[in-house]
Structures are given as structure tokens and as C-alpha cells.
């Protein structure tokens, strides 16, 4: 290779790297702006920003992980606005990319399955929700172990589905596992512990165990009182 060609090649490589860095910065800025809009409760603006972020991410390739990240955030914004019809295919598109990039057993796959399951549960589509939430929980347990705080979230979501299905007896052991994990991982005075106690109390009331439910409600109130 001649000196001139060598210099030209180096210049091309440097320019490409600079261009990619600018693309990356542009995408990251869009994602940050979208998150800020969500935190402000401006879902219409967040939707617009995340749609633009998807297009920016696609410049890296249609199956680039950044596309899946952008799609996941967009789907969450759709869901936050009650746009189930719009959210589901976007989640599915993100899931397809995550599975292609990472395989079946990956935290991003589990998170997307979980979000899809919660979406279906919210709209009363319990038969579709259950296998998604069950699969998400299984992946988390395999990757993180049975006592990780993210496993508690999966257990709680599955328990909530069982309550919605009119099966409080199946929800109780799931909530108890979630409670034990959260108490151990987050401490006995954490707000998530209080929330789990309240959900478990609700289940016990449905099972006719009023005294036990009252005890848990009082524990939850004590936690919230200490933090107020």
C-alpha cells in the first residue's frame, strides 16, 4: 500500500469513528430527553422523542441493541398512556431484537417478557399474560438466583396476576416469597416491603383471614409512618 493510500485509509477510519461517536451522542441525548419528559409526566413529548430515538438507533443497524432499548422505552410510554394496541407490537419488536442479539436467557429478554405480561394483565388478557410472566421469572431465577430483588418483582407480578384471575390461594405463596426477598435485600423498613405487606394483606382478606391481614396492614403502616 502506497503512503498516499495509507494516509487516505487512516483518514477514512478516523472520520468513520468520529461519525459513529456523533451518532452515539445524538442517540444518548435523545434517550435522556425522553426520560426527562417521562419524569415530568409529559408522555406526548416523550413519545415524540422516543420515536426519533428509534430512527437514530436504526442508523447503527435495524437489529442493533440500541434499537431495542429505544423501542422498549417507546412501548412503556405507549402503555403509560393506555395505548395497549400500540405498545404490544413495539414490545414484541424489541423482544425479537433482544433474543437475536443476546439469546433466550438474558436480563433484557426477561424485562421485556415481564413488561409484555404486565401489559396483558392490565387489559384483562390473563391467558396471554401468564406464560410471559412465568418465563420472565424463570429467566431471572436462572441468571440471578432465587433470592435476588429482581426475582421478587417477578414473583409479585405473577402474584398480582393470580389475584386478578380470582386465585388468591396461589397468590399467597408468591407474595410471601417476594416479601422474604425484599426484607432480606432491602431491609425490613423499605417502602417495597410495606407495599408487599399490603398486597399480601389484601390476599389474606380474600381468603377470609381477617386477623392476619390486619396484622400485616399495621406493619405496613408502621413502616410508612417511620419514613414520613
Which positions does each model-derived feature cover?
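Conserved alpha-helical positions within TPR/SEL1-like repeat arrays
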Residues: 28-41, 65-80, 91, 107-122, ...
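Bacterial signal peptide processing site
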Residues: 23-24
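Short coil/turn linkers that connect adjacent helices within long alpha-helical scaffolds
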Residues: 59-62, 100-104, 142-146, 184-188, ...
Amino acid at each position: 500500500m502506497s503512503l498516499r493510500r495509507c494516509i487516505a485509509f487512516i483518514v477514512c477510519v478516523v472520520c468513520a469513528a468520529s461519525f459513529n461517536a456523533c451518532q452515539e451522542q445524538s442517540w444518548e441525548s435523545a434517550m435522556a430527553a425522553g426520560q426527562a419528559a417521562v419524569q415530568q409526566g409529559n408522555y406526548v413529548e416523550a413519545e415524540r422523542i422516543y420515536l426519533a430515538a428509534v430512527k437514530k438507533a436504526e442508523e447503527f443497524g435495524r437489529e442493533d441493541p440500541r434499537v431495542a432499548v429505544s423501542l422498549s422505552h417507546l412501548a412503556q410510554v405507549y402503555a403509560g398512556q393506555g395505548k395497549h394496541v400500540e405498545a404490544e407490537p413495539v414490545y414484541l419488536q424489541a423482544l425479537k431484537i433482544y433474543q437475536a442479539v443476546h439469546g433466550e436467557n438474558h436480563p433484557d429478554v426477561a424485562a421485556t417478557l415481564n413488561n409484555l405480561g404486565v401489559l396483558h394483565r392490565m387489559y384483562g388478557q390473563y391467558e396471554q399474560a401468564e406464560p410471559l410472566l412465568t418465563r420472565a421469572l424463570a429467566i431471572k431465577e436462572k441468571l440471578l438466583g432465587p433470592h435476588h430483588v429482581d426475582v421478587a418483582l417477578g414473583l409479585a407480578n405473577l402474584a398480582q396476576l393470580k389475584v386478578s384471575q380470582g386465585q388468591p390461594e396461589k397468590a399467597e405463596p408468591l407474595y410471601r416469597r417476594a416479601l422474604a426477598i425484599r426484607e432480606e435485600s432491602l431491609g425490613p423498613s423499605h417502602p417495597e416491603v410495606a407495599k408487599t405487606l399490603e398486597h399480601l394483606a389484601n390476599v389474606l382478606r380474600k381468603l377470609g383471614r381477617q386477623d392476619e391481614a390486619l396484622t400485616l396492614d399495621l406493619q405496613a403502616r408502621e413502616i410508612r409512618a417511620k419514613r414520613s
